[in-house]
């Protein structure tokens, strides 16, 4: 008897918020990568940019999102899409969980390098 390969994966975005910023890859498929960014209150991701378009969604908490010399308040379930090469930054106003959607050819390592620089 031949069994069918599992065609789906259920992913929990619930994260324990630790001190600072922690990232993990949640989903990778033929189209995109989904990254979870857990940010403790007052943690900051300095100015950076992506080589492809991205989408950012706040799943929990609130983020002061800086882009194009503006500060935008993103609250739970708010999202924003950016074109490639737009410089942006994130400040967690409270413990927050952020969903980052990357183009399939972007890399998880690039996101990690933002935290290390």
Predicted regions located by residue number:
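Short beta-strand His + acidic residue motifs that chelate non-heme Fe in jelly-roll/DSBH
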Residues: 45-47, 65-66, 82, 87-93
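Glycine- and acidic-residue-biased ligand/ion/polar-headgroup-sensing regions
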Residues: 52-63
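Short acidic-glycine-tyrosine-enriched beta hairpin
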Residues: 69-84
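A short, N-terminal "cap"/entry segment at the start of jelly-roll beta-barrel domains
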Residues: 1-31, 66, 115-117
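A cytosolic small-molecule/anion-sensing beta-strand core signal
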Residues: 59-60, 75-76, 94
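Conserved short histidine dyad/triad with adjacent acidic residue
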Residues: 20, 33-50
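Tight coil/turn sites that cap or link beta-strands
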Residues: 40-42, 77, 85, 95
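Ligand-binding loop in jelly-roll beta-barrel domains
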Residues: 84-108
